């Protein structure tokens, strides 16, 4: 399986729990697709942009 879970936007796919989903656009992806977001970030969404090596990203800074 592609570790990036890349697929057409809105298309269903099966992202594994360990998947980092760097470029995931899957509507079915239940987890955040931003590896640097802190756990439990309510605002975290697919397509957020990581800011450097910190634990902050564009959607839950």
Swiss-Prot record:
The modification Phosphoserine is found at residue 58. A divalent metal cation 7 binds at residues 50, 57, 59-60. The keyword Metal-binding applies. Residues 30-61 are annotated as: Alpha. A divalent metal cation 4 binds at residues 33-34, 44, 48. A divalent metal cation 1 binds at residues 5, 7, 21, 24. GO terms for molecular function: metal ion binding; zinc ion binding. Metallothioneins have a high content of cysteine residues that bind various heavy metals; these proteins are transcriptionally regulated by both heavy metals and glucocorticoids. Class I metallothioneins contain 2 metal-binding domains: four divalent ions are chelated within cluster A of the alpha domain and are coordinated via cysteinyl thiolate bridges to 11 cysteine ligands. Cluster B, the corresponding region within the beta domain, can ligate three divalent ions to 9 cysteines. Belongs to the metallothionein superfamily. Type 1 family. This is Metallothionein-2. It comes from Bos taurus (Bovine). The gene is MT2A.
